[in-house]
Structure formats: structure tokens, C-alpha cells
């Protein structure tokens, strides 16, 4: 009677006898391959990019530099922080100076944005121009940027503020640097003299 039920339902007798899903997975090479791929991807997701987990240093990156104390820079002082003269890489955006050393692959000498290292990158980022000619050697007040370019620059400023350490500001010629205390709160030079 059981054989008649199988014939009546149209089911394959081997499916009813075996392990069902497990039988399907382990008897098909394609399913085995997909299962292996799923396990590998799950392992990569769970394990993630744990630093030092593999025991080797893939990129031969130098050890991280200590955090730079907050200070202000003239365009000439900023220029030496290009990743060549000094291992640290600084960039100015919208009057703010950021330590972008951890982004060496992008902003280092061989990176796609290496032209901005040690410079005020505001004009280049606002105009989407990676030419060295777009950058000025002296302080750039950016007064000739269009509203759309100013908005683009503001977006870059927000991204850098979120991602990189803000180490100070870019000084105009003749501007006095801000004195920063150990807790990195700015104090004007005149307020400091009155104490």
C-alpha cells in the first residue's frame, strides 16, 4: 500500500527514504561548492580585518606615529609634512589642518591625491582638480569659489573632520597662532598673556 501512495503522489522513492535537504546538499557538486563558499564568506565576515591576526604585515606600513599636538601652520610650515620630508602627512582644507597619515595610500607621495600632501587642498578639492597648478603656495582665501564649489568644499571638510585628526588651522600671513593647552582647547594669544 505504501508503494501505491508513492506512485499516486508522483514522488521519487529515493527522496522519501534519504535525508532530504542534507542528502541534496552533499550529493550535488554545485551545492557543495556553494556551501563551501558560504562558509568561507561567513568566516571572513566574522573574522574581519583584525589587526595582527595573520601575524604578517601585508603592506609593510611603518608603525603609527604618535598623535600630533595641536598647533597652527603657515603654508610654508605645512609644506614639509608631505610624507617625503617628514613621515607625517598633513593637509589643509577650508582653513583647518588635518593629519591624514593613516590615509597614506591616498595622500602619500605615490597616492592618487599625493599632490595635496603638505598643502592647502581646498581649491583642488572644491574644483575637482588634481593639478599642482590649482594649488597656491601662499594662503588662499577662496573668495572666488562659486556657491556650488563652496558647498563641495564644505562636504570635503565634513568628511575630513569625521575621518581624520584635526591638528590646527592654516594661518594667513601675519596672523598670530593660537596657543593650545594640553587638553587641546584653543586660547587666543592675548587671553593667554592676560593670565
Swiss-Prot record:
Region described as Disordered: 173-195
UniProt topology in membrane: Single-pass membrane protein
Molecular function, one GO term: heme binding
Disrupted gene: phenotype observed: Double conditional knockout for PGRMC1 and PGRMC2 from female reproductive tissues results in postimplantation embryonic death leading to subfertility, with female mice producing fewer pups/litter than wild-types. They undergo premature reproductive senescence, producing fewer litters overall during the trial compared with wild-types.
Classification via PANTHER family: MEMBRANE-ASSOCIATED PROGESTERONE RECEPTOR COMPONENT 1, MEMBRANE-ASSOCIATED PROGESTERONE RECEPTOR COMPONENT-RELATED
Note: Non-classical progesterone receptors involved in extranuclear signaling are classified in 2 groups: the class II progestin and adipoQ receptor (PAQR) family (also called mPRs) (PAQR5, PAQR6, PAQR7, PAQR8 and PAQR9) and the b5-like heme/steroid-binding protein family (also called MAPRs) (PGRMC1, PGRMC2, NENF and CYB5D2).
Listed name of the protein: Membrane-associated progesterone receptor component 1
Amino acid at each position: 500500500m505504501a508503494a501505491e501512495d508513492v506512485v499516486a503522489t508522483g514522488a521519487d522513492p529515493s527522496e522519501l527514504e534519504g535525508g532530504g535537504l542534507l542528502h541534496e546538499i552533499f550529493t550535488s557538486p554545485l551545492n557543495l561548492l556553494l556551501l563551501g563558499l558560504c562558509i568561507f564568506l561567513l568566516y571572513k565576515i566574522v573574522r574581519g580585518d583584525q589587526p595582527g591576526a595573520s601575524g604578517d604585515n601585508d603592506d609593510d606600513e611603518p608603525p603609527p606615529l604618535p598623535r600630533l599636538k595641536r598647533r597652527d601652520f603657515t603654508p610654508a610650515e605645512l609644506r614639509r609634512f608631505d610624507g617625503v620630508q617628514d613621515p607625517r602627512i598633513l593637509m589643509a582644507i577650508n582653513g583647518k589642518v588635518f593629519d591624514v597619515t593613516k590615509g597614506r595610500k591616498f595622500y602619500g607621495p605615490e597616492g592618487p591625491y599625493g599632490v595635496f600632501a603638505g598643502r592647502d587642498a581646498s581649491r583642488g578639492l572644491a574644483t575637482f582638480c588634481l593639478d599642482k597648478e590649482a594649488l597656491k603656495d601662499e594662503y588662499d582665501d577662496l573668495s572666488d569659489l562659486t556657491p556650488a564649489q563652496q558647498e563641495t568644499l564644505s562636504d570635503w571638510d565634513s568628511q575630513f573632520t569625521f575621518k581624520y585628526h584635526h591638528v590646527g588651522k592654516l594661518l594667513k600671513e601675519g596672523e598670530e597662532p593660537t596657543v593650545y593647552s594640553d587638553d587641546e582647547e584653543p586660547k587666543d594669544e592675548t587671553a593667554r598673556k592676560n593670565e
